[in-house]
Amino acid sequence: MNVRKRSGKVVPFDAEFIRRAVTLAAAAAGEHDPDGVDRVTEAVQAKLEAAGQEAVDIERIQDTVEETLFEQQFYRTAKAYILYRMQKEKERASGEWQEGILTREFLSPYKHMPNPMEQLGAFVYTRTYSRYLPQQGRREFWWETVRRAVEYNTSLAPTSREEAEKLYDNIYHLRQFLSGRTLWVGGTPVAEKYPMANYNCAFTVINDFVAYHDLFYLLMVGSGVGVRVLKSDAEQLPPVRTDLTILHKSYDPVPASERLEYTNLTFHRDTATLAIGDSKEGWAQALSRYFELITNREYEGITTLVVNYDSIRPKGERLKTFGGTASGSGSMMTMLDKIHKVVTAAGARDGAVRTQLRPIDLLDIANIIGENVVSGGVRRTSEIGLVDADDETCIQAKSNLYRQVNGHWEIDKSIAHRQMSNNSIFYRKKPTREKLHWHIQQMRYSGEPGWINEEAGLKRRPNFCGCNPCGEILLDSNGLCNLTTVNVMAFVQEDGTLDRSGLLEAQRLSARAGYRMTCRELEMYRWDRVQKRDRLLGCSLTGWQDMVNATGLDRAGQAQLLDELRAQARKAADEMADQLGGNRPLLVTTIKPEGTLSLLPTVSSGVHYSHSPYYIRRVRITATDPLCRVCEELGYPVLPEVGQDPKDPTTKVLEFPVKAPAGRVKGDVTAI
């Protein structure tokens, strides 16, 4: 028996499509009954075979499913199935489907496949990457997310349909991934308006005040940013005046139609008025205008700055482009106030109306900016601060973050912003044994400061200036990187052998996908120039130790495989660069921490061992997220975030039991 699809194509009958559709309808109706689903599927197949037709129309099959559900008294499931059919018919009639490089025919089987993720992976996917579809009144399915991301990536440079289909199939089956940022924003208006939202990693040297504009903007679009605040960097900044008075106009929100999108600075006698625009650009411009007023001597006659927040949308209003809700004007007011306090405190410290900011001031300002940012209503700020080896003030910046009050530890609110960044010493030369001993002792207490070896970085790239917050990408100032990942464990076959050809092909696709991301023009010129010059790729691996455990690969075998994977990525990247006429990538491979993406296939993160044979994986979620409420109703372990009000937390934590694949785990190996 065959099936005639709406396109007219005839394909073999497969009862699994019916079983999948009935299962989804039953789950939506709360009538999930595996035995009942089997009975309905078998009854539908029997009816169709009894009709004796060589090819059955898809509509006839769906009608038969409805009839059978009613006959077997699955009334709620029948209703859910009918509503689903009606919704799909509306979508087809509206012409919403716009066929790209991936055809409807190619995608059709994936729509009916079971989700390849286990419970933890499915939860993390739904929380993190599945976008809400307002016209359908639901979140994306996995096949739709992959389609959106792959269509976006392959649109950035000429790509064959065969390559796009291979990439899609690998991502769908969790063998490899584009960056988590692209899974979230790729193919949406966000990616068109804010291309830099695709990038995981960025870095800037704070040697001019424009760097703070860029830092603020990048954090708002969701990138993690490293900042370097060495003494030599601070010396390049112009002095700041510390006698400007800031007044905050009381907030009186204007209607949406009257809001300014961009920030407006006007002058009247000795007063400047800063009307902040209601956009990411507007907020970043406001910060730039402030620094211009306190650094440019042409504004010395301005004694007062009045800040107008009326165009900023009220707290809680839905953000249509990025998703999430608005933070309101309060966070912006707090940010400007705290930055100005840093500036005026520097003047009081030095006893001067005009003074040079020190590295600790620069670090404080970067952290205050980070404190103000909640990107897309989903992700909080990710920063790293790189400081001098002899800068005790910066090194000890977080030493007194907590203090005892009436027998309880409380955070010092005046410096609470300093928790926004992890800080590392930027060693420009080899430290003495005594210095290293001291450093290790410091790390025993709080894990900080970390260290960055500039000499080692310069051997790998001559213009190395710093790194991203996770520390795995070597960057020049105004440099960024988009990361891709191959799940090595997914290429272990049932007999315990490794599918090397499939793995190497995935690495080739990973490098090509990464290079395509460098072909997108970025919205900030300084960053776009560095991007086009360096074309950095970040081809990463995950599930490595799971693969080693499963295949028994020894150290020599691992080294050989890593060499092959590196060579494959470099070759693919260089070939694509030559094909498109762009620069060959300066760097191609890396290993990132692989936190969130590794949870989708639930494999060991990056090249790390699994934590233990059995462990509890805890995942944070916003307390008001409907997904959180569903998990609570289903009886999942849901707990308030540590340190928050147990009765009314803003963040909750879900617990998932995880069983690691057989083999060595973290406790079975030494630290070296």
Question: How would you name each of these model-derived features?
Answer:
Residues 1-672:
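Extended catalytic cores of very large enzyme megasubunits
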